Amino acid sequence: MAQKYLITSALPYVNGELHLGHLIGCYLPSDVYARFCRARGRDVLFVCGADEHGTPAVVGAAAEGLPIIEYNNKYYEKHLRAVRDFNLSFDLYGRTHRKTGKVNSRII
């Protein structure tokens, strides 16, 4: 049976679009490692997502005059598009405000 690996990356806030700093600083190193592990036949689960909680989201939503959920949706979609455009190999790019995130946070 293949060795199992859980690989994660820092979750950026949804207070703006992703940029090269996100790619170089956190996504690229973990993506390279995930690809390396897969190439070696390891069972990899590579996860990340958008952090939709906290002050940055609240301040950003207020600055744009949007309800927080609309603001989160707007920037999550932009983040997801950037992840795809960068061709990152995440198995899951999630969201912290989903019900599963709340349930799992309580379990942890």
Predicted features, each with a name:
Residues M1-I108:
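N-terminal, positively charged nucleic-acid-binding surface of large information/translation enzymes
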